[in-house]
């Protein structure tokens, strides 16, 4: 069995909470940010600066910029020192049509709630109704 510490070193995360409680995968924001910070060697601080100082996402308030920064870091790490983010950048530049799937794979590795709910969601057909109660019941068991 692979230890959590080894996975964390690659960029996987095991948080108690989840950005998915109040946010989506922020796919559009990720795309804007990765276009704004075009250097694949850029350190994490450059991504954070782009969101918070440069307001590349066009947020109306400083608080919204900080919230967006926090969720983007939780979802994607934005840290080229981690293999997961480096892989995201590598494939992002090579497959524009694959952006949604690449983002999903990265978030799946970093978001506990998404991983926990995948077994419930994946067998459903597109357009199926998922109620809060049914999801809570699944997650509680």
Question: What are the language-model segments listed below?
Answer:
Residues 2-109, 130:
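Eukaryotic partner-binding/assembly regions in large regulatory complexes
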Residues 34, 118-122, 136:
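Amphipathic alpha-helical segments within well-ordered protein domains
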Residues 38, 122, 140:
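Hydrophobic/aromatic-lined pockets within catalytic cores
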Residues 108-121:
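A eukaryotic nuclear recognition-module signature that targets compact all-alpha binding cores
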Residues 123-127:
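Short helix-capping/hinge SLiMs at alpha-helix to coil transitions
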Residues 131-141:
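DNA-recognition alpha helix
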